[in-house]
Amino acid sequence: VHKMGIKDITICASSLGKAHDPIVPYIEDGTITGIQSSGVRGKIGEAISTGRLKNLAIMRSHGGRVRAIESGEVHIDIAFIGAPTCDEYGNMRANGGKSDCGVLSYAMVDAQYADKVVAVTDCLVPFPNIPASISMVDVDYVCVVDEIGNPAKIATGAAKPTTDVRKIMMADYCTKFVV
């Protein structure tokens, strides 16, 4: 996209952290001029805070992001969705590959409302990849890459698995209560 000279892009991500720091030069050169997210950390947050983003950054809750997309307040031209597993037709799942993650629910609204949807995976599996979190009916293209993410950079802050015994015990109690 950058090499093609496309400018004035708005990124509407569920969250941006240090794994996304490499986009800062594209903020500085005007390729990326807007950011809408539920959270921004690292060098991107610093770039926004120091006025290097041309337009205002818009922060919403995860649910607010969904509402904005569903209502048409936010229009998504192209959604690139990282999928730990995907078949050749675009059925995406969050597990079964080398980059397993939580659920793909944050990306479901993107898949349903974007003009074009690209499933990006590092684990192409045989059809049908079921049960699919995101169905092939919402996917236009499948792109296979070497690695969809770096867990060391993604699992930070609230998304970082804890080793704190007290927090693990609290989570265990909550699970027992709910179940």
Cite the ranges covered by each PLM segment.
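Conserved alpha/beta enzyme-core scaffold
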Residues: 1-179
